[in-house]
Amino acid sequence: MVQLYNLHPFGSQQVVPCKLEPDRFCGGGRDALFVAAGCKVEAFAVAGQELCQPRCAFSTLGRVLRLAYSEAGDYLVAIEEKNKATFLRAYVNWRNKRTENSRVCIRMIGHNVEGPFSKAFRDQMYIIEMPLSEAPLCISCCPVKGDLLVGCTNKLVLFSLKYQIINEEFSLLDFERSLIIHIDNITPVEVSFCVGYVAVMSDLEVLIVKLESGPKNGERVHHHPHKTNNRIRRTEEGISNEISQLESDDFVICQKPLELLGEKSEQSGLSVTLESTGLADEKRKYSHFQHLLYRRFAPDISSYVLSDDIKLHSLQLLPIYQTGSLTSDGKNLSQEKELLSLFCFFSLPHVGYLYMVVKSVELMSVYQYPEKSQQAVLTPQFLHVITSNNLQCFTVRCSAAAAREEDPYMDTTLKACPPVSMDVCALRIQLFIGLKAICHFKNHIILLTKAEPEAIPERRQSPKRLLSRKDTSVKIKIPPVAEAGWNLYIVNTISPVQLYKEMVDYSNTYKTVKTQSCIHLLSEAHLLVRAALMDASQLEPGEKAELLEAFKESCGHLGDCYSRLDSQHSHLTLPYYKMSGLSMAEVLARTDWTVEDGLQKYERGLIFYINHSLYENLDEELNEELAAKVVQMFYVAEPKQVPHILCSPSMKNINPLTAMSYLRKLDTSGFSSILVTLTKAAVALKMGDLDMHRNEMKSHSEMKLVCGFILEPRLLIQQRKGQIVPTELALHLKETQPGLLVASVLGLQKNNKIGIEEADSFFKVLCAKDEDTIPQLLVDFWEAQLVACLPDVVLQELFFKLTSQYIWRLSKRQPPDTTPLRTSEDLINACSHYGLIYPWVHVVISSDSLADKNYTEDLSKLQSLICGPSFDIASIIPFLEPLSEDTIAGLSVHVLCRTRLKEYEQCIDILLERCPEAVIPYANHELKEENRTLWWKKLLPELCQRIKCGGEKYQLYLSSLKETLSIVAVELELKDFMNVLPEDGTATFFLPYLLYCSRKKPLT
């Protein structure tokens, strides 16, 4: 049974001053109502709470059987009957119909208007005749594009809205019959059309398909009947033949109820064929279709009900558009709308069904009516249903489904929305005598009432005969009495904000007794406001701000309700409070702190919200009183979370004595841990008790302390207003235990508790350095990263950081601001990325007796990195410019880099010029294997040439030449050796080497 709330969604009402009893009526956009009676259509102006006034009237060809209005194109379309023939006509430019006798132009669909006649069509109403080969039964206009769908027996005809461009200033509305949808064995009672989605309904069947453009699966489209299951088709034909045979014996064959969703609906047995009738084949709008839903109902034979009690009614497709898809000035609404979600509603007399049909097809809600319904109309906020004497208002879940389509963050810790599956309810059952028809537009409900004498059946028929397919209606005999009275009412629905406030007031009756009932009603209020915000085209100026405020307030109310829950839904406290815009202090101020039976109980919802809020760095600091209450709350509900809570920046103002007392209680209660120890050490530091701090820090090994910091990073690092802020404990460790601090931050990075850039910023802020200055502690951290070989660290980026810093210090002769934690020897022994420094490098460095010892470590680390196996030498060359080759340090680095790039000849030239004593060690280390020829091709000629020139380095060159000749004499044959010797040399100098080379072969 649907829950009923006695609310007041309906406001004032007025009577429409029409002269004849309406046959049909419908809304006309934002400000008009059309009423068809006899052979005339009257248009009434409807604006807000003002009285309904006649606007214009125009004659029709005959009695109006169906009437529909399209906001896109601003036209009215009608099915009219005259002399037992039906006609389809569209009334365009009706707003220019000033008097009933004003001239009207009539033209056929697709008729080109000549220039001289265009002025007449611009300034007066004109009618478009749309001939059909079969009688039209029902019509529907696309609310987005303005296309017209017409239902006929076994087929649907689609007329596309288009415009004939007469000149630059004027275009004429027209239609083109673009598509025929053949559907075998169905007589449509109602159709609905929206942006390619087609819904068709017979007495007991509903079919929904989606028309699609472009070749299916990239293939050329051939128009032929859509293949259906042959077995099902044969079964259907067999049943049809059996029915014809058996009905003569008073047997009734009823098909089973059936629901097919998605691709399965192809098995419905209905043959669907598309026939394109557009003029231009390349501009074909729809070329194939997709089955979405098929549902078939069957009468309950055991109930012996009349046939009218088993007929479907009120088929409707309801679109919901993207929020903010309309232009700010409200113009070109139909062109600017972007479909977000689409819903389909249809109803039996006692049950209504609401489906979602866009991305997935699923049944959202089932409506059980307390009495037989006659008609229903669906809006984004409500479902309005009329029975013979009641107007019923039910809630819907359209906005809940659309919100999830629109926002990917829905149903997360950031945002929430009441579930689509939540039970619907009735807000109001309003008494109206003799209700016959209903329609809805904007914030108005139009009702037709007629008090008729009681209908008397002509004769009593057997239940079997009433269910016969040949006799689907009951003949009613009406006594020849005077026509009963009738009225056409406009019922104004109250504003969403006003109804929302009433629902909130109503929910207070359940607040302390039935939390779930309170949540249900507040959820309905929330969805009401959300739906109103989605339907931006219906909002009055200034109403949106009021709705947004109501939306936030409703989120706060829902947060309050869920905070009192201790169930699986208590986690919804967090997103609702977030959406409410309430601060944590404001939420705590709304909390009931009363104590019952001497025990304070805190529900899981509130604990969940506070816990997450304290973790999310909200830049909100609680005052001392609220902070103490929060600690007390967690000590009672979740004592293990107390250390984490105390580390939150929001708890900055808590009294350290209060914090320490709760931490000591944890020790005595058996909750002692490394995290409790570190938190006590941090609190002791705030209290200024250094002895207690030292004792706590000494109670565990350094490895355990690192594990504790990994469990709670906020002991070291906090964020305030988006900026990283080191804690007081981190500042203290920088001075007393920098190694522990670096190891802890490295552990945080290794466990994904802090990013690379965040860690760099932390050390810069910790050491009070600006963005361009690199403290030694950060260099220590980079070196520790290399040693640890973290998988997520980009090696070359880390190499670049370190080498840049080493080079900068060497070029500026800038010593580290603190003592490095590791020496170059430590790094070489601990890390494979730091290589052994080449022996000849030591010779180069030792040649400078005036070398500055303050930066020897930086030079050694840089040389070691360059000598390592992982370093990309080419990437560092552009950054070597500040390190001049004029210094021995710069010389060693430049020669090292060129050596790694295999520029050996250039390196030999540099060393011969700058440091000849290092040439032989260099050659011994580098000139091997394929480079061994450089001994006699490069080094030997260069030394001979420099010896000829003499100078201060003569003796160094001479000793180097002797070493070189010794190596060459071993490597070359005598003939080759003689060829590489200089022609003008002293024979006595080279003779020993020649003799050694000549004896080398016999000796071996």
UniProtKB/Swiss-Prot annotation:
GO terms for biological process: intracellular transport; melanosome assembly; pigmentation; platelet dense granule organization. Keywords: Albinism, Cytoplasm, Disease variant, Hermansky-Pudlak syndrome. Its main location: cytoplasm. Component of the biogenesis of lysosome-related organelles complex-2 (or BLOC2) composed of HPS3, HPS5 and HPS6. Interacts with HPS5. Interacts with HPS6. A motif (Clathrin-binding) lies at residues 172-176. The lineage of its organism: Eukaryota, Metazoa, Chordata, Craniata, Vertebrata. It comes from Homo sapiens. It is linked to Hermansky-Pudlak syndrome 3: A form of Hermansky-Pudlak syndrome, a genetically heterogeneous autosomal recessive disorder characterized by oculocutaneous albinism, bleeding due to platelet storage pool deficiency, and lysosomal storage defects. This syndrome results from defects of diverse cytoplasmic organelles including melanosomes, platelet dense granules and lysosomes. Ceroid storage in the lungs is associated with pulmonary fibrosis, a common cause of premature death in individuals with HPS. InterPro entries: HPS3 (IPR017216), HPS3_C (IPR029438), HPS3_N (IPR029437). Involved in early stages of melanosome biogenesis and maturation. GO terms for cellular component: BLOC-2 complex; cytoplasm; cytosol; early endosome. Changing R397Q: In a colorectal cancer sample; somatic mutation. Widely expressed. Higher levels of expression are observed in kidney, liver and placenta. It is found in: Cytoplasm; Cytoplasm, Cytosol. This is BLOC-2 complex member HPS3.
